[in-house]
Amino acid sequence: MRELSVKCRQNGLVFSVDNYVKDGIKNAAKSVSSDKLIAAVPFYTRLWLETPKTDAELASEEGTEAANYKNKVSSTALGMDEAQQVVQDAGAQTEWDDTTKQNYAQWETEDGTYKIWLEDTKSLEEKLKLIKSDNLAGVAEWKLGWENSDVWDMILQYVN
């Protein structure tokens, strides 16, 4: 799964529209007709924390792929409303990233640098537009209960 890859741990995304949704649909459609294909969308976001590696950690990783990254990265999964609250509590401002089609925020604390690409109704709508334009059979969501109250009316606008 993408979120477990080293690249994702550096980039912080769960499922961006630009490549993972478009490419996922395109690749799946090579094996399954669109009228039988269901695309999944996330109702969660990951809050990423980057902390600088110590000199000892960098030395121990020398010669490995991990040595290419100067920060340790950890993450926590958050539901849509909880993620919005974390951003608000941090006093951070979100801005729309047109490449990933997600709202993004970043802030610093004594713990390190926090980064979050929000899954919200706006980012979800971008994914649903692709699902509808590719005439897919439907949409699946993960994880039920982590969505905010606005998503279901929007989903009904895009899914048969």
Annotate each language-model stretch with its function.
Residues M1-S5, I25, T121-L128, L136, ...:
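Extracytoplasmic/secreted envelope proteins and their assembly/folding machinery
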Residues A39, I131, V139:
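Conserved, mostly hydrophobic/aromatic
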Residues N19-K22, F43-W48, S123, G145-N148:
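Solvent-exposed loop/turn segments at secondary-structure junctions
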Residues M1-D23, K30, Y158:
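Chitinase-like catalytic core of GlcNAc-active glycosidases
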Residues T99, L130-S133, L144-N160:
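Aromatic-rich peripheral "rim/lid" segments of glycoside hydrolase catalytic domains that contact
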Residues N11-L13, S33-L37, L136-A137:
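Short, well-ordered coil/turn segments that N-cap beta-strands
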Residues V41-L130, V159:
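Glycan-binding loop/region signatures in secreted carbohydrate-active enzymes
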